[in-house]
């Protein structure tokens, strides 16, 4: 009997696939049988670590380099991907800029909103149209703990990730009845480049660990199961959720 989690023959786009959470998501999808189109701001045409990881599982990998802060580049990427028979879109690319709200430059605000929210809507719209025409598809956003909480010194990031949670629900309301499931994963405190400043701050890191019932920072592989679930037939009746993968952070 075929597993409901089997992704053999599926084509998945994963943005921000070069490292961190996106790398782990792409590899998990490949392990489940999907071929991968990896998109990142800087991604080698061949020979990248993520290509090696995907092909080690016997799956095909295609690399696309795209600057998510560039409005024109994102529009062109959407047009390029819209003609592909994409089954799964993982909107994971993101950035973070830290500064107190009273001093936060508008240029940084605009960049974070563009990369973390606007570009993801453009890609979802372009790829989503094709999915709607075919009557099936899975779209997964990477949300955040700051889709639920306010954070400190990251006003643009919090606004963007709150927007991602809202966009997930908005698209799900329109598309669930047409065969396209739209959901989000909200990682907790995961040990990646984006959280390096927190990991390097002994007091802040200790405070974070004290609140996580699991007692540790998450790692990219912790997102794999949730990603495969939301990308597979196992989640066909799941739409509009923001699924925390946080070691219990929000339950504390």
Q: Where are the regions that the model predicts?
A:
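Substrate-binding pocket helix/loop in short-chain dehydrogenase/reductase
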Residues: 100-101, 108-113, 208
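C-terminal substrate-recognition "lid" of short-chain dehydrogenase/reductases
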Residues: 121, 178, 216-250
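Conserved glycine-rich Rossmann-like NAD(P)H-binding loop of the short-chain dehydrogenase/reductase
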Residues: 34-49
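Conserved glycine-rich cofactor-binding loop
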Residues: 11, 18-19
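Alpha-helical segment proximal to the catalytic Tyr-Lys
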Residues: 129, 173-177, 236
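Residue(s) in the substrate-gating loop at a strand-loop-helix junction
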Residues: 144
């Amino acid at each position: 009997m075929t597993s409901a989690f089997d992704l053999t023959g599926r084509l998945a786009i994963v943005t921000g696939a070069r490292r961190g959470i996106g790398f782990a998501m792409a590899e998990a999808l490949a392990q489940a049988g999907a071929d991968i189109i990896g998109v990142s701001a800087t991604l080698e045409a061949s020979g990248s670590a993520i290509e090696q990881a995907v092909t080690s599982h016997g799956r095909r990998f295609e690399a696309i380099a795209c600057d998510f802060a560039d409005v024109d580049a994102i529009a062109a990427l959407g047009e390029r991907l819209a003609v592909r028979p994409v089954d799964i879109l993982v909107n994971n690319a993101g950035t973070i800029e830290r500064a107190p709200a009273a001093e936060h430059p508008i240029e940084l605000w605009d960049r974070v909103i563009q990369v973390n929210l606007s570009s993801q809507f453009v890609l979802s719209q372009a790829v989503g149209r094709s999915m709607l025409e075919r009557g099936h598809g899975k779209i997964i956003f990477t949300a955040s703990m700051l889709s639920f909480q306010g954070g400190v010194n990251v006003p643009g990031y919090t606004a963007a990730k709150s927007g991602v949670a809202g966009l997930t629900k908005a698209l799900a309301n329109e598309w669930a009845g047409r065969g396209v499931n739209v959901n989000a994963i909200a990682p907790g405190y995961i040990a990646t480049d984006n959280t390096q400043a927190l990991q390097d701050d002994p007091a802040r890191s200790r405070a974070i660990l004290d609140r996580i019932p699991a007692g540790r920072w998450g790692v990219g592989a912790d997102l794999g199961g949730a990603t495969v679930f939301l990308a597979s037939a196992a989640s066909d009746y799941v739409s509009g959720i923001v699924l925390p993968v946080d070691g219990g952070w929000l339950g504390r």
